[in-house]
């Protein structure tokens, strides 16, 4: 089972007990306005998300980690890698993404978890490039992407939801935390 420890976090595969706390995160409009179509997700939809993330782990050898706070064991959210299917500018490439419950914002958890995920991409999966997209209006994600050393590579439009996106990439052959 893949686990990564950082000074404050445990990144791990999903457990049955994660469904309720992740559903609470997915029910928060402030969190979900930055994800996909911006709509909140039900517990059933969240269960489908976890199932899809676990399938990606089985098929690709990477996926979304559960982000757990060391000490308290509280689920803070999700971070990980996936093969992007859209927008066309990054389709087929490995993308990093995250979502954290609102109570965990502004504490550096997203940056800490994302750094550990990029290290995993290089050291455990041998990836040489990772991409990301963010909504143009999402300044908090822009800050995290900057801290990761990811470079803005242009813009795109979400083909399903119509949002304007900023596209980022990083050459992991020279990645250093």
Show which residues each predicted segment covers.
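Conserved GNAT-fold acetyl-CoA-binding loop/helix
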Residues: 30-52, 63-65
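Short loop/turn motifs at secondary-structure junctions and domain boundaries
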Residues: 56-60
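Acyl-donor (CoA/ACP) binding surface of acyl/acetyltransferases
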Residues: 1-34, 64-177
